Amino acid sequence: MADAWKDLASGTVGGAAQLVVGHPFDTIKVKLQSQPTPAPGQLPRYTGAIDAVKQTVASEGTKGLYKGMGAPLATVAAFNAVLFTVRGQMEGLLRSEAGVPLTISQQFVAGAGAGFAVSFLACPTELIKCRLQAQGALAGASTTSSVVAAVKYGGPMDVARHVLRSEGGARGLFKGLFPTFAREVPGNATMFAAYEAFKRFLAGGSDTSSLGQGSLIMAGGVAGASFWGIVYPTDVVKSVLQVDDYKNPRYTGSMDAFRKILKSEGVKGLYKGFGPAMARSVPANAACFLAYEMTRSSLG
């Protein structure tokens, strides 16, 4: 139980560090993912990541890059407590004897279990965040574009109240749960396995206790990049479902969204916002893992 509390505290600190560093990149990613497909002959609202940054800062100021941070900030303790605590508990179940490091394949399984558990928190949190981040990109969409364009949200609680009142109650907050599973389970499995594998590569063996902060930063960056490298299309599907109009939906489900994106935009449509996501993943996850390791070490 003592280890669980240490994982909880360390995960909370790591998650806060990740959020502060990575949220502006995430805002741009969601804006690019959720902007409506332009009519033939017209340009999209944002021509790329840099253009999205310029337009966001011009219309909303720098604070626009941090729009929607209240939702993940309010739940960062619970989110990372679940992620790192479940991972720690699964490590205990998988470990053959006390003090023996897990194999990389066992780290993969532990990460998958943590990803499954955290999906139940990630889905409603990210639905709220995506609605807030995307409303600027959707504001110019026509009422026939089947996106949530008319609703203007005042903040995270306003989104939650609207969904609970007008979109099927609590079930509405879990819109996009399937693609959230499809992202979090393989993504976290790969991320934790890659993190441990790279640490062992740098240490030259399974004892990684002597690694310095620079090595932990590199390992965290590699881990973050590996997460997005394998699951990014599922994140695009999740985002478009979560900002889709409840009354006049464009998509009937995850597979329908996948097929329609592929048909209308090609494979590149499944990688909208990939640049900002990868640019975010390296520093944000480096900050997360470094903060986690330092806090965990200080707790003994």
From Swiss-Prot:
Disruption phenotype: Chlorotic leaves and impaired growth when grown under ambient air, but normal growth under CO(2)-enriched air. It comes from the Eukaryota. It holds the Pfam family Mito_carr. PROSITE patterns: SOLCAR. It is found in: Mitochondrion inner membrane. High expression in cotyledons, leaves, flowers and developing siliques. Lower expression in roots and maturing siliques. Not detected in meristematic tissues. Its main location: mitochondrion. The chain crosses the membrane at residues 8-28, 64-84, 108-128, 176-195, 211-231, 273-292. Belongs to the mitochondrial carrier (TC 2.A.29) family. This is Mitochondrial carnitine/acylcarnitine carrier-like protein. It comes from Arabidopsis thaliana.
